[in-house]
C-alpha cells in the first residue's frame, strides 16, 4: 500500500470510527447512565460483534458483484428498525432524577446490534473493497485488516464511553435532555441509512 493510500485508509477509518453512530451513542449513553465499569459488558458485546461483522465483511467484499440488492435493502430496514428501537430505549430510560437505575443494555443486545448496524457494515465493506482488495486478495491481509478495523471501531466506542464517564455528573444533571438528544441522533442515523 502506498503512503498516500495508507494515509487515506487511516483518515477514513479513524473519522468513521469517531463520528456518531449507533455504537458510539450507545456507549456514551451507557457510560453516562451506569459508569464505565458497568458499561464494559456493553462494550464487550459491541467489540465481539464488531469483529465478527468485519470478518463477514471480508467474505462479502469478495462477492459484492453477486450480492442480491434486495438482501442489502432488507438489511438496511432491519438495521433502521433496531436503531429506532435503541433510540426508544434511550429516550424512555430512567434518569437518576427519576429515582430508578435501569440495568445497562446486555452483552447480547449490544452484540446483536452489530449485525444490523449498517454503518459498520458499510465501514468494513468500503475499507476492504477500496483500500485492501485492489492491492491484494491474500486472505491473510484481508483477515488482518478486518481485525484492525474492529480494533479501530472498538477504540471509537471506548472513547465515547470514556466521554460519558468523564462528563457523567453533567450528563446526569441533564439526563432527560441528553437521552432525548441521543435518541434523536439515533433516529437521524436510522434515516440516513436511506437518504
UniProtKB/Swiss-Prot annotation:
Residue ranges of the TM segments: 8-28, 47-67, 70-90, 105-125, 142-162, 177-194
UniProt keywords, alphabetically: Amino-acid transport, Cell inner membrane, Cell membrane, Membrane, Transmembrane, Transmembrane helix, Transport
Its membrane topology: Multi-pass membrane protein
Segments on the Cytoplasmic face: 29-46, 91-104, 163-176
One GO term of the biological process aspect: cysteine export across plasma membrane
Recorded GO MF terms: amino acid transmembrane transporter activity; efflux transmembrane transporter activity
Keyword Ribonucleoprotein among UniProt keywords: no
Entry's localization field: Cell inner membrane
An annotated GO cellular component: plasma membrane
Topological domains annotated Periplasmic: 1-7, 68-69, 126-141, 195
Cited InterPro entries: LeuE-type (IPR001123)
Catalytic function, reaction form: O-acetyl-L-serine(in) = O-acetyl-L-serine(out); L-cysteine(in) = L-cysteine(out)
Main location group: membrane
Family as reported in the entry's similarity comment: Belongs to the Rht family.
UniProt function note: Exporter of O-acetylserine (OAS) and cysteine.
Designated name of the protein: Cysteine/O-acetylserine efflux protein
Amino acid at each position: 500500500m502506498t503512503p498516500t493510500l495508507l494515509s487515506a485508509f487511516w483518515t477514513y477509518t479513524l473519522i468513521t470510527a469517531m463520528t456518531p453512530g449507533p455504537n458510539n451513542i450507545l456507549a456514551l449513553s451507557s457510560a453516562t447512565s451506569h459508569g464505565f465499569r458497568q458499561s464494559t459488558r456493553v462494550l464487550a458485546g459491541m467489540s465481539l460483534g464488531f469483529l465478527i461483522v468485519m470478518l463477514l465483511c471480508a467474505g462479502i467484499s469478495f462477492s459484492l458483484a453477486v450480492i442480491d440488492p434486495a438482501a442489502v435493502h432488507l438489511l438496511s430496514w432491519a438495521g433502521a428498525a433496531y436503531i429506532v428501537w435503541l433510540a426508544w430505549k434511550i429516550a424512555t430510560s430512567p434518569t437518576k432524577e427519576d429515582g430508578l437505575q435501569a440495568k445497562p443494555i446486555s452483552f447480547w443486545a449490544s452484540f446483536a446490534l452489530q449485525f444490523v448496524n449498517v454503518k459498520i457494515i458499510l465501514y468494513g465493506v468500503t475499507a476492504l473493497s477500496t483500500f485492501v482488495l485492489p492491492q491484494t486478495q491474500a486472505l491473510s491481509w484481508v483477515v488482518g485488516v478486518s481485525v484492525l478495523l474492529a480494533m479501530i471501531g472498538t477504540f471509537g466506542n471506548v472513547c465515547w464511553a470514556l466521554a460519558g464517564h468523564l462528563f457523567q455528573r453533567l450528563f446526569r444533571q441533564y439526563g432527560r435532555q441528553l437521552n432525548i438528544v441521543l435518541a434523536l441522533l439515533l433516529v437521524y442515523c436510522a434515516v440516513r441509512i436511506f437518504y
